[in-house]
């Protein structure tokens, strides 16, 4: 059910097997704690499309007016944008698409269980609680179809 990956490239194997969830645990950069503790108390949400070719520019534009300049001036902000850009490029390659739908926010949108009606979802949690996949024996996967 779960594929534990060693690196981002190993995530590419996910769609060639029957796992339902792939997990890649990464080490948090030392200078990220202060940045994310400040970002987490700033309510924001932004969404749009991010192209593989212009991922850094697209993400920068999406966050430009949504994240306060004080946070944007933090030296870690550029590292964070670059990381999101690399993940988006990888997911475009994974999906074999030129662009992907992108959402970024400081508050969880889903408070309860739901079914995703998308073939694949790339969820990245930088700070705080992530997400949980219910095992098949705990969920009726056909109930919402």
Question: Residue spans of the language-model regions?
Answer:
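N-terminal auxiliary "cap/dimerization" subdomain that precedes the catalytic jelly-roll/cupin core
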Residues: 1-68, 75-82, 86, 90
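Sequence-level motif detector for i,i+2 pairs with an aromatic at +2
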Residues: 18-21, 97, 120
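A structural signal for short, well-ordered beta-strand segments and their strand-loop junctions
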Residues: 22-25, 99-104, 124
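Extracellular-facing segments of soluble proteins and assemblies that are Gly/Ser/Thr-biased and enriched
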Residues: 68-107, 111, 115
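Catalytic core of non-heme Fe(II) oxygenases with the double-stranded beta-helix
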Residues: 107-145
């Amino acid at each position: 059910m779960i594929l534990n990956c060693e690196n981002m490239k190993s995530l590419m194997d996910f769609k060639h097997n029957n796992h339902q969830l792939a997990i890649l645990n990464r080490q948090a950069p030392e200078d990220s704690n202060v940045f994310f503790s400040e970002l987490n108390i700033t309510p924001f949400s932004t969404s749009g499309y991010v192209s593989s070719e212009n991922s850094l520019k697209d993400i920068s534009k999406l966050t430009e007016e949504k994240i306060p300049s004080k946070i944007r001036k933090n030296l870690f902000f550029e590292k964070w944008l670059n990381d999101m850009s690399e993940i988006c490029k990888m997911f475009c390659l994974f999906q074999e698409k030129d662009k992907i739908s992108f959402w970024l926010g400081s508050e969880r949108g889903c408070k309860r269980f739901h079914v995703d009606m998308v073939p694949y979802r790339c969820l990245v949690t930088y700070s705080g609680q992530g997400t949980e996949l219910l095992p098949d024996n705990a969920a009726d996967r056909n109930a919402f179809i």
